[in-house]
């Protein structure tokens, strides 16, 4: 596990269209607001990848990657099993750009609360566990919840 994210950091959340990156970024921004952490899902790197996909133009990559180096952490939202070819290509280009520039990233999988918990763990912030409810004791001999049969 990585060290806890320092206050004032910037986290980028990247992913193909429809991957849930924007939804995760919003949830993280709310969760990390008290730490004064900025969460971005609309980054120069994502724009550079989009331009490469549409026009085959990689001219924005160097500047985008240099800007991205200032981010404390990059979370890449993993694709689900039913991703289309365009999403797979976007994901592959994002991974290649980050890896090629030597920028570390964590791939985040899951849905909803599970995805948020996985992202928090990747940032070195454990998601609080849901409170456990202990089933009330119900004695089948006397129906008294505090009887000696409980022992």
Which residues are covered by each model-predicted region?
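C-terminal accessory "lid"/substrate-recognition subdomains
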Residues: 2, 106, 113, 120-151
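Post-Walker A helix-loop "phosphate-sensing" segment adjacent to the P-loop in P-loop NTPases
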Residues: 30-38
């Amino acid at each position: 596990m990585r060290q806890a994210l320092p206050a004032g950091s910037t986290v980028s959340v990247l992913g193909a269209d429809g991957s849930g990156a924007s939804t995760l970024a919003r949830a993280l921004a709310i969760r990390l607001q008290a730490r004064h952490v900025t969460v971005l899902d609309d980054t120069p790197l994502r724009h550079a990848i989009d331009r490469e996909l549409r026009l085959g133009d990689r001219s924005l990559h160097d500047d985008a990657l240099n800007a991205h180096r200032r981010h404390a952490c990059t979370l890449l939202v993993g694709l689900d099993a039913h991703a289309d070819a365009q999403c797979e290509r976007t994901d592959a280009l994002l991974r290649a750009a980050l890896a090629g520039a030597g920028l570390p990233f964590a791939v985040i999988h899951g849905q909803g609360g599970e995805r948020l918990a996985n992202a928090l763990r990747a940032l070195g912030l454990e998601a609080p566990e849901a409170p456990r409810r202990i089933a009330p004791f119900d004695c089948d001999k006397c129906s008294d919840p505090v009887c000696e049969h409980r022992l």
